[in-house]
């Protein structure tokens, strides 16, 4: 199959898609790339505004023939077109059918679960890497845990991560959360091992992996912990990584568990966070969402340049080995996490699948429905100049 395009950015007219376009143009080192979406006029505008000389491909997310023409020519498809459960399923299916690697920025694990069930075996047999969640959801959690594990050189019993960040609210994430609230996903949302293969965890590991985290003082990092709004997305990805690594005989540890929290400087801040998280949950599952939704950022909108520039994320990891030793690692990133950091990360993931595929984890023939850590290793973080976790 003659693939004459290295990377296609699908959803290039959206806010995050346009950031990916700008970033890829800034680091372009001779690759062939294109922009794609469903609206020719908007794609033309993106090309004009960014002074691009790249191919424009029109392909609606429901047009299987157009998607097929796109994926037959593309080595890697980078998608920012969410909510992904609405707009992404046929694109992923086309990537698997036509042997194109794929990355995106979804946090919709219930959708990823469906992809695993439908496409993992075929993608694995073809050596095609389908890697969702390559943005702020869930690379800091996933690659932070992965890299910390390489530094302790011992089987890991437990990792707890603690997150703080500053940035604008992601309109796409909010739209996804509102749409998920009406899908009746209770059992799936509560399954802490939703993305894991069957029989890849014990009941004891399940019991130690509850989403019901409260407020606690963490002496190791001199801070308070509380619920983190993205933990339900990130934790499932990290646990799938652990299972996929175990299949390659590279497991974190047979007793490995992972939980995720928000990081707070004071007990009072943690209390406020707890009640805010509860309030968000109530809004999403009740008619209150119809009152709040008109005031939320709309898909396609995003934060100002100032907010993007001054944002950051700060993740701390407490790593406990099976022999009881504890270490603390820290991972930092500059820029608004939901947009600037996310656009850089997912673009570097796509570039890794073009430039470094022969040296990526698992070997050149490895494939399936993967995670950033199991499918890419440390490569995306090192290229974006984010700070890899260092021992605190």
Where are these regions (language model features)?
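N-terminal Rossmann NAD(P)H-binding glycine-rich loop of SDR-like oxidoreductase domains
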Residues: 9-23
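Conserved small/polar residues in nucleotide/adenosyl-binding loops
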Residues: 384-390
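Active-site-lining helix/loop region of Rossmann-like oxidoreductase modules
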Residues: 10, 150-315
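Conserved glycine-rich Rossmann-like NAD(P)H-binding loop of the short-chain dehydrogenase/reductase
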Residues: 30-39
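C-terminal active-site/capping subdomain that shapes the small-molecule cofactor and substrate pocket
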Residues: 252, 264-382
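Rossmann-fold cofactor-recognition segment
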Residues: 50-62
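Glycine-/Pro-rich loop/turn segments that contact NAD(P) or position catalytic residues
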Residues: 84-191
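Conserved Rossmann-fold cofactor-binding substructure of NAD(P)-dependent oxidoreductases
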Residues: 59-73
